[in-house]
Each structure stands twice: as structure tokens, then as C-alpha cells.
Curated annotation (Swiss-Prot):
Cellular compartment(s): Cytoplasm
Domain S1-like: 1-72
Protein biosynthesis as UniProt keyword: yes
Species of provenance: Bartonella tribocorum (strain CIP 105476 / IBS 506)
Keywords tagged on the record: Cytoplasm, Initiation factor, Protein biosynthesis, RNA-binding, rRNA-binding
CDD domains found in the cross-reference section: S1_IF1
PROSITE patterns attached to this UniProt entry: S1_IF1_TYPE
Lineage, opening ranks: Bacteria, Pseudomonadati, Pseudomonadota, Alphaproteobacteria, Hyphomicrobiales
GO cellular component term of the entry, any: cytosol
Any Pfam family hit: eIF-1a
Gene from which the chain derives: infA
Protein name per UniProt: Translation initiation factor IF-1
Domain of life: Bacteria
Function: One of the essential components for the initiation of protein synthesis. Stabilizes the binding of IF-2 and IF-3 on the 30S subunit to which N-formylmethionyl-tRNA(fMet) subsequently binds. Helps modulate mRNA selection, yielding the 30S pre-initiation complex (PIC). Upon addition of the 50S ribosomal subunit IF-1, IF-2 and IF-3 are released leaving the mature 70S translation initiation complex.
InterPro entries, per the entry: NA-bd_OB-fold, RNA-binding_domain_S1_IF1, TIF_IF1
Amino acid sequence: MSKEEVLEFSGVVTELLPNAMFRVKLENDHEIIAHTAGRMRKNRIRVLAGDKIMVEMTPYDLTKGRITYRYK
């Protein structure tokens, strides 16, 4: 997938789910399910409930996303 097709949104983690999945509430009040990106997993960046994050989504499935950044 090329970078032009990716949609980026900010949101807040509301719930931790099994298998390293997270329920995220986006700034536009949509709720999605997201997983951490491979680079975040590799660098052991922890994501907890209440963290403000950046999520990448594909325009084809707007219910799932990938967490790419955790704000400090």
C-alpha cells in the first residue's frame, strides 16, 4: 500500500483488548479497533488506556487501524 492511500487520525486509547489490540476513540468520535505497528512492537513502546496516539487507516476498512505513534 502506498503512502497516499493512508488516512491518519489522532485518538485516545479507551480499552485494552486481547492479542495486543486496542479500542480507540478518534477525534471525530468514531470508535475503531487498532493494533500496534511493527516498529512500535520492536522498540517495545507500551500503549496503555488513556494514551493519546496517532492511527493509520486504509480507506477500504474504516473500522480497523494501526497505531503508529504515541504522544508523550
